[in-house]
Amino acid sequence: MSRMNWPRVATAGVLVVAGVMGSIVASQRTASAMATSANALLKSLDPEGRKKLALPLDSSDRTRWNFVPTSMFPRQGLPLKEMTEPQRKLAHELLRSALSDRGYTTTTAIMNELEAILRDTEAAAREASGRGSAGGQVRDPELYFFTVFGTPGEKAAWGWRVEGHHVSLHFTVANGTSVAAAPSFWGSNPAEVREGPRKGFRALDKEQDAGRAVVMALDEAQRKTAIYTETAPNDIITMTAVTTDPLTPEGLTYSAMNPKQRELLMALIDVYVSQMTADIAAERMAAIKKAGVEKLTFAWAGPVEPGARHYYRVQGPTFLIEFDNTQNNGNHIHSVWRDFANDFGRDLLREHLAAVAH
């Protein structure tokens, strides 16, 4: 190697090291914020509340998850309903430690506004039908359960989740520097509020619009490839599986798209990635690019017209996004982010335990 190339190589090396160190520092920042918030919430509770909130890291309940109402799926953990107002604020600080501003706004809109709208809408429908306003599913904005698994700390492996109807977010932390944030589920019923003071409100508007933008940007031949079936599935395909393998390759590849279409596909992925803190989002996007964007696929099921029942998914070597809007006559969304290696921090915990063993 000539002397004149040394500075260039040295500079590249510095940039690589800086990038790695920046990622570690960023992850450490999020992990530290999570631990601080979780410990503050734990400290605020009496023994009975702490017993509900805190479970061992190896609890079988850590990977038991769902997105249906609690009346259909009894949950462990401490619900907002049983917290004092100061404790609720601490629980929300924990939620904020993991999410971007948009992610927090989306999540709390589902928890608060949509549950209340659904409760009132269903009660009015029952009363109009002569069944009375009582009965049906319990729709309660305070029935969202927080659970901490293990002991939050700088060197510890631990995790936490928040879950209730249409929200199921899972986080695993190891060594105080690494965070896995999957699976992540958000739902919206209705997808669009059709009446009342909040008419027109859509909690998951970006997820819906960005997906449609991709399929509508395709030419006729590309669309025939992307739409792998004319009938959308009744729900997300992976449902509440603990682990998820890549689904059968369907749809149009990134390589078969033009530059504008590729830009729209990456923008769609970013909608999901950017629900998390900037640190987590940057790591997710870096992992996607490292695995090869040319391996990404976009698949659509059902009609493309607005209001029709439809489904789409984006899949890469490391992750899967599913979006389904088929229930309630095409006005009820389920969406999920799955990580093939790190749902519930599977690989993260394996690496942590291997390091501790040595």
Predicted regions, residues:
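A cross-kingdom marker for long, charged
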Residues: 24-358
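Hydrophobic membrane-insertion alpha-helices, especially the h-region
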Residues: 12-22
